[in-house]
Each structure stands twice: as structure tokens, then as C-alpha cells.
Amino acid sequence: MLSCLLRNDKRLEVFFSALDMKKSYLLALSGGSDSLFLLYLLKSRGVSFTAVHVDYGWRESSYREAEELKLRCQEEGVPLIVDHVPSKYTTSKDPENTARRYRYALFCKICREDNLAGIFLAHHANDQAETVLKRVLEGASLGNLKGMTSGASYNRIPLLRPLLHIPKQVLMQTLDAENIAYVHDVTNTDERYLRARMRNKIFPWLEEIFAKNITQPLLTLAQDSEELSCYMKQQAQPFLENIRQEHTTWSIEIPKPLIEQVFLAKWVCKEFFYKVGIVVSRHFLQMVYDHLSRNLPAEMRLRDKRVIVKAGVVMIE
């Protein structure tokens, strides 16, 4: 059933047809349903990979689970690296982000040492929906609601996520049908962590209120955001080609026809600041646009920089 289901998935076909099968990769293997599904998927596709399991020691059963993974990978002929995380990384005030930084640094280190071409991650449709909703509630811009992508990078190493369109329930049902055992990580339901609170409380509550599954609408929003971002980059590029640098001064022309297109004008200004190495707030961007649209000269401080707005020009010194 596993192979049959996966062979009928058009998006997986597209993903793997573009993958360089001559290279070897790294699989982040937790032992949960998601990463085990991905392990068998990669095997069924003939992908060469090394699995890496990070044991944080957060659960009493974690050492035993790591040993069971060793046996499973040995049976499947999959090379496995097990890393036991030092306690100083597991007792921080922000364990979620500390753990994420640790394992990504480890994955990158192994990729470079073993000449592995990318990192396979088992994020699925529910993870994607959580990411999008989190960004909506945090006030992300329309172009930044796209969530995770199937091919991103971290420290110049590709992050490969082929399961983003597949719901977790499908992964679990497929493994259950094949009698493939997997770890039920209790930290996934530990409400000390934001993701667990979203999973246990916010999503069920919203689905009860709306009487519908909200995952697919959020995935659609992510797709729309990605398409909008690509479109805006194309529209902004001709204006960004007018960026000039003289010594330590950067400048860009913002002509009147552009100023009349509010969304595009602010996008161009934001990208201009970003290319100079500055991330600006919505409030600051709005101030810059307001002075441009009213043709009012202004000087503003932005950390150690001076931003000058003149008629149709923004300068950074």
C-alpha cells in the first residue's frame, strides 16, 4: 500500500524527478510517523541517504527509542548516526528554538563532512498550516505567509521537504496499514510549547467554530502568498536595478508612477533597505512612503544609518 499510494502522488513525482539521484542526502529521523514515512519513501525511490537521529534526552524512553531506531535502520540497510545532545542545550529558557538551532547546526556539519547534498525533513501539511496561522497571527506581510517550501536552504545547504502537501493522518494511516511501528513523541502534545498549544487547542477550537477543516484553506493561503511574492519580485526588479552606491551612500529613484502604486512602491522600498542590509518595520516603511507620496523631504535615523527622503529619491547614509 505504501508504494502504491506514493506512486500515485503527482506532486511527489515532480519532486523526485527533479532530485539529483547521483548524490547522497541526510534524513532527519526522529522515529515518529512523519520521518519514518519519509525513510520508507526515500528507500522506495532509490534515494541514497544517511539517517541522523538527535536524542535530546527529554523523555525517559528516548535512549531506548534510539536503540530501536538503530536496529530498524540496520534491518533496512540505512546508515544511521545517533547524536546524544549535551545537557547544556536541553536546559535553556527557550528549549524549542535552542533544540532547533542545535540540530540544524549538526545536520549542516554532517552534510559538509560526509559530502551530503541536502537535508530531508518530514514536515507535512499540518505543520505547514500551523506555520501559516502562526505567521498570520504574528502580523506577517502578505508576501511572507507562504510558510515552508519544498526546496529551501540553511547555511547554503538545501532543505528538502517533499511531504508538505500530505496530511499527517495520511502518513499515520499508511504506516498503520503496513504494521510499521513508530514513536509517539509526548513533547508534541506538551503545552509548554507553542506548536503543541496550537495543535491541541487552537486548531480544534477553530475547526469546531467553523465546522470545517481549516488546514486546506491555510495551505491555499500559503500558495497564494508564494505566487504573490514571485509576482512582486518580477514587478519590483526594474526599479531595483536603479539602486546606486557612491562611497557609503546608497540611493534609489522612486518615480511618480511607482508612488501611485502603493503596494509596489512599499515593496520596492522594503527590498531596497534589505539589499543594503537593513530590515525595516511596517511603521518605518509607511513613514518613508508617506513622505514620498506627499513630496515632503525628511531625514530619519535608523540605528546607525541616516535615511534621507527627497522628491522621488530615497537615500541611506
From Swiss-Prot:
EC class of the enzyme, as a word: ligase
Principal localisation: cytoplasm
Biological process per Gene Ontology, one example term: tRNA modification
Disulfide bond sites: none
A GO term from the CC aspect: cytoplasm
Top-level taxon: Bacteria
Catalytic activities: cytidine(34) in tRNA(Ile2) + L-lysine + ATP = lysidine(34) in tRNA(Ile2) + AMP + diphosphate + H(+)
EC number: 6.3.4.19
Keyword tRNA processing: yes
Domain notes: The N-terminal region contains the highly conserved SGGXDS motif, predicted to be a P-loop motif involved in ATP binding.
NCBIfam families from the UniProt entry: lysidine_TilS_N
HAMAP family hit by this protein: tRNA_Ile_lys_synt
Role this protein plays: Ligates lysine onto the cytidine present at position 34 of the AUA codon-specific tRNA(Ile) that contains the anticodon CAU, in an ATP-dependent manner. Cytidine is converted to lysidine, thus changing the amino acid specificity of the tRNA from methionine to isoleucine.
Annotated protein name in UniProt: tRNA(Ile)-lysidine synthase
Protein species of origin: Chlamydia abortus (strain DSM 27085 / S26/3) (Chlamydophila abortus)
Lineage: Bacteria, Pseudomonadati, Chlamydiota, Chlamydiia, Chlamydiales
Gene behind the chain: tilS
